[in-house]
């Protein structure tokens, strides 16, 4: 076996060097060309488009790509290059004519390494993991639409807050209205006390004070009812629209009679005395209210013209009201005479035993008044008999209120809807003028100079 000599190998090497020199007569810069080649190599590896074509002009010291048997990163996450993609890579013409290295948008060169690979894996390429990550990121970035249950709960919370504010506002208004009514009631009590109109021990019973407050509220509500009825009459509404207002006014008088019925059994003297009415109204008071026959006379003046049939019905109702009034007046006068006989009996108190002054406590004053009434030789039977006769006043008060309501219903039946509307408006105007006259008399009448 013959081996080539050393001189032959040297000649072959020199001839090879000469041939390479002849192919590249211009020469190249070793460090710069190597840097550019490495940069292009890593760029192609980052884009996963390795070139399999033979590059025509490569330097001697160019290191070819070798198989990475032990990769530093897992290979299952990176896509496998296809031959079609490898063949599509552009060939490298030469180091002196290559394009410059890729740069970022701001002009700085891209930094290749673990950061770019991690960003590529995070974006996901064309895999399903990237699509899921993109959809998750879009859901996080986009505005969230609440579900119907949350929207319904928010709407319920807003509605509850609105109702709470309305209740608070109504409660504050109610407190303010109650304060005004209480101040007005205190003024009336002081005015009545100054005139010496209190009966008994000089104080109002709790039931009487409650009734006064209820009557004030009823007057305010009745004023609103009549205001609506008056507006409907002035606007010439048809009978179908007037009918509900007329029925409302009629039923509101029933509310007043219910308030009076609750007080009749507890304190009939308060109703009979008329302290809950104005000073001028008390002059026209009849057994705790208005006289039915006088009310019919007032109404007829404001609902004319009437037909003959209506005139006959009105006259009949007026005659029936007067008969009932005469009967009640006779019974009440008989009761008062009987009460006077009991009080003026032989067991009445002597001159040395007088009714206690009002400065005493009510319970003590009541005890002393009972002892004074029975007298030194009297008995408890006379006092009990007088109390029973006072309690019988409630019977007359109930019958008088029943006659008043009966008269109102009779007027409602015999009149048309429009006439009935004018009837209730006229009744309210009548009592309103009486109250205004009392207020005018109290505030404007001249006071005599003190002598």
Curated annotation (Swiss-Prot):
Residues 141-150 have a biased composition (Basic and acidic residues). PROSITE patterns: BZIP, BZIP_BASIC, DOG1. Residues 1-32, 70-151 are annotated as: Disordered. InterPro entries: bZIP, bZIP_sf, TGA_domain. Its main location: nucleus. Residues 1-22 have a biased composition (Polar residues). Residues 147-191 form the bZIP domain. SUPFAM superfamilies: Leucine zipper domain. Residues 149-169 are annotated as: Basic motif. Belongs to the bZIP family. This is Transcription factor TGAL8. The gene is TGAL8.
């Amino acid at each position: 076996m013959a081996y080539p000599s050393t001189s032959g190998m040297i000649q072959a090497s020199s001839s090879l060097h000469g041939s390479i020199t002849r192919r590249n007569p211009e020469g190249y810069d070793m460090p710069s060309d190597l840097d550019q080649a490495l940069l292009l190599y890593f760029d192609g590896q980052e884009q996963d488009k390795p070139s399999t074509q033979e590059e025509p002009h490569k330097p001697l010291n160019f290191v070819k790509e070798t198989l990475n048997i032990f990769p530093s990163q897992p290979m299952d996450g990176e896509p496998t290059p296809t031959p079609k993609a490898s063949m599509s890579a552009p060939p490298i013409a030469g180091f002196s004519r290559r394009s410059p290295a890729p740069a970022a948008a701001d002009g700085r060169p891209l930094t290749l390494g673990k950061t770019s690979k991690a960003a590529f894996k995070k974006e996901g390429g064309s895999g399903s993991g990237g699509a899921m990550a993109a959809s998750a990121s879009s859901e996080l970035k986009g505005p969230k639409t609440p579900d119907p249950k949350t929207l319904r709960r928010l709407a319920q919370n807003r509605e509850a807050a609105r109702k709470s504010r309305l209740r608070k506002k109504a409660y504050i208004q109610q407190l303010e209205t109650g304060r005004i009514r209480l101040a007005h009631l205190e003024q009336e009590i002081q005015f009545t006390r100054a005139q010496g109109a209190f009966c008994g021990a000089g104080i109002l019973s709790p039931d009487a004070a409650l009734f006064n407050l209820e009557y004030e509220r009823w007057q305010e509500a009745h004023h609103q009812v009549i205001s609506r009825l008056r507006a409907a009459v002035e606007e010439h509404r048809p009978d179908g629209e007037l009918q509900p207002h007329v029925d409302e006014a009629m039923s509101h008088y029933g509310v007043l009679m219910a308030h009076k019925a609750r007080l009749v059994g507890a304190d009939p003297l308060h109703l009979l005395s008329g302290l809950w009415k104005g000073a001028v109204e008390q002059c026209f008071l009849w057994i705790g209210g208005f006289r039915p026959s006088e009310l019919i006379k007032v109404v007829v003046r404001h609902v004319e013209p009437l037909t003959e049939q209506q005139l006959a019905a009105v006259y009949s109702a007026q005659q029936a009201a007067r008969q009932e009034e005469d009967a009640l007046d006779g019974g009440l006068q008989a009761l008062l005479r009987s009460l006077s006989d009991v009080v003026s009996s032989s067991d009445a108190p002597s001159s040395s035993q007088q009714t206690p002054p009002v400065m005493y406590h009510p319970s003590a004053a009541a005890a002393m008044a009972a002892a004074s009434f029975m007298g030194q030789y009297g008995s408890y039977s006379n006092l009990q008999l007088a109390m029973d006769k006072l309690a019988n006043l409630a019977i007359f008060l109930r019958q008088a209120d029943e006659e008043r309501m009966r008269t109102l219903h009779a007027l409602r039946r015999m009149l048309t809807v429009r006439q009935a509307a004018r009837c209730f408006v006229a009744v309210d105007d009548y009592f309103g003028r009486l109250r205004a006259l009392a207020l005018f008399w109290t505030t404007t009448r001249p006071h005599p100079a003190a002598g």
